[in-house]
Structure formats: structure tokens, C-alpha cells
Regions:
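Short hydrophobic/aromatic beta-strand micro-patches
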Residues: 18-20, 106-110
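Long, charged/polar, surface-exposed segments that mediate recognition or autoinhibition
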Residues: 96-98, 115
Length: 123
């Protein structure tokens, strides 16, 4: 049965989800050694001392610097993009799920009990 969409033409799915972590190394360790995600691309640092391209393209402070960004494969779902930012106006309070910008990611596993045991063992 064909479904006619009024949405974005040619939309096929989600490619990646970007996350800015307060501690890049700790987040990378969790993604790689607890979840088992596979890193496949890294770049950085980059920013600008003399233009507003960070503000214009990424909606961050013009002098913000992306220290590192690393992409991870996550099974057959969207990839995870991990960021480490440094910015003069950076807020360092984690949003609650009810706050604007609050979020969560749900993973699909074959055995929820085995997955929970694995996560608890790495707590």
C-alpha cells in the first residue's frame, strides 16, 4: 500500500544523532566499551577567531571551538555523533527531560534482561 507523504520529499530515515558530552573521553569509553559502538570518523579541532561562521552555520557562539567530533556506528539504526565543544557562553547544566533540549535515546536489543545485566555490571 503506497502512502503519500506531505512531508520532506525523498525522506528515507535518520542518519545520525548529535550529542555534546561534558566529558568526551568518558562518553567515548561508554559508547565503545560498554555499548560496543564502532568509531568510524573523527575530526577537530576547528573554529574561527576572525569570522562568524560557527554562529552562522551551527548556531553557537562565534568563538566556540569544536575540540573533537567522532562518529559511531550503532547497529542498523542512526549513527551517534559525539561532540566536545568549548565556548565562552557554554551552559553546563544538564537539561531535564521536560526542559527544552531534553532528550533520550532508546536502543533495540534482542534480550532486555541480558542487556540490563551488562549495563549494571558497568555501572
Amino acid at each position: 500500500m503506497a502512502h503519500e507523504s506531505k512531508g520532506l520529499p525523498g525522506l528515507r530515515g535518520t542518519d545520525h544523532i548529535g550529542i555534546t558530552a561534558p566529558d568526551f573521553d568518558e562518553a567515548a569509553d561508554f559508547l565503545e566499551n560498554v555499548l560496543g559502538l564502532v568509531p568510524f570518523y573523527q575530526m577537530g579541532p576547528f573554529g574561527s577567531d576572525d569570522s562568524d561562521w560557527m554562529k552562522d552555520l551551527l548556531n553557537v557562539h562565534p568563538r566556540a571551538v569544536i575540540r573533537r567530533v567522532r562518529h559511531y556506528r550503532c547497529g542498523h539504526g542512526p549513527n551517534i555523533e559525539l561532540f566536545e565543544y568549548e565556548s565562552p557562553d557554554q551552559r553546563k547544566v544538564m537539561p531535564k527531560n521536560s526542559d527544552w533540549g531534553g532528550h533520550h535515546i532508546t536502543l533495540y536489543v534482542d534480550d532486555i534482561d541480558a542487556a540490563m545485566d551488562h549495563l549494571r555490571a558497568h555501572d
